[in-house]
Amino acid sequence: MATIVISMFPEEGHLIPSFKLGKSLKAQGHQVYYLALADFEEYIRKQGFEYLPLFAEDFPKGFRAQQTERIANTRGRAFLKEVSQTAFYLKLFQTVHEDQNPIKRSLLEIGTDLCLFDGFLAPLSLMARHAGLEVISLSININLPQAANYPPVVTNIVPDNTPASLSKAGMAWKFSGLAIKITNLLIGYNFQKKLTELATHFGFSADLVVPAALFPRLRPQLEIPELVLCPQAFDFPRPSVEQGIFYCEPSIDLDRQEAAFDWSQIDPNKPLIFCTLGSQSHIYKPSRRFFQTVIDTMRSRPDWQLIMALGQKFQAHEFANVPANVQLLQWASVEQILPRTSVMITHGGVGTIKECVYFNVPMVVFPGNRDQPGYAARVVYHELGLMGSMGKVSAQALETMLNQVIQNPNFKQRVTAMGEEFRALEAASPALELIQSKLPHTRTVAS
């Protein structure tokens, strides 16, 4: 039995996709800890994992709720700092620089054999590797380096085989790099520079750190391999896959401990539409208007029915003229609802999209920010659904899009075919096999 520590970027969209893998490791007899902020402790323990506190004094329980309020009520630089988790990263870089820091001490005290750290937590990976611990980078995002005719994941460009597509992808990478520089200036923090300094501080080569469309990443290598929790079938074609990068299963947790959904108000004979903008719907400025647009669309379609998950910030009473065929909830279990869903309206979070594919549900995607435009583009590329603008779509246009996806059998056929690949990979569990091959028989760590 090995002791394994998982730590994910402090958002539900990163944490939840790791649960299936964590449970699979537990089922193999390993002891699995999660290193996380206090706000996630209860949810982590509910899934059956051990918990290690992370920055308990600086980010006590209740921090996430306070941050939600700040995000909803700020603009400009303050907004960018919050959604970029700048305060968290400042604390992380400061802590891992310290030789005898509490994170390192916790890892050594429990006899950690292997660390599975989010690709967005590269500072942790560098610290743990320097301490002699085995590390695997765990990516729920497709945050891969630049390649020919491979647009950055922050854009909604859908590539094709034309010379113009090659040029467009190259220009998009240039603009993406410029956008990162501007963001760094606005928030007053250069993540690429800080991560490079940290790498050299720990004795690694400066070129270990490379730019990417989202967060600067560690160059793929066999010393710190990267598991991408997304099947390669969903990605755009790449000229080659770099050594040390492994596309794996979608890692869909079908056994999350959540309240059972009440189906008494749902008519099994009507098409069911499920709408969610994820756990952080409040960070998208058009989200309130968008939710109302979806509700207005349903008012003219009594032959359809809708379940809408509003997220933690919005309340049902804030929306007007809600018809009887609409249920408004703050949170709903995707895994319980998707098997009965005809079409999903989503913000394009990679976790939600993977779940839709797994359950053969075509999509209408309205990407918010970060990497969501890139996943929406992949949905269009593979003909799994349609893409629209969250801030511009009208009720009439949305009805047309939903009609097209529901009535055109090609979308259902394409998503079902990819769903078969997803389920086959889930059963094969290549990530689990790769992780177990990395577990050391003997372990020597720096004190």
Where are these regions (language model features)?
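Conserved nucleotide-sugar phosphate-binding/catalytic loop shared by glycosyltransferases and other
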Residues: 33-84
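Short, polar loop motifs at secondary-structure junctions
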Residues: 36-41, 119-123, 231-235, 310-315
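Short gly/pro/ser/thr-enriched loop/turn and capping motifs at secondary-structure boundaries
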Residues: 41-42, 58-62, 142-148, 152, ...
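Conserved nucleotide-sugar donor-interacting segment of glycosyltransferase catalytic cores
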Residues: 92-173, 221-222, 226, 232-235
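Donor nucleotide-sugar binding/catalytic pocket of nucleotide-sugar-dependent glycosyltransferases
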Residues: 212-214, 221-235, 242-253
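Conserved catalytic-core segment of nucleotide-activated headgroup transferases in glycan assembly
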Residues: 237-314
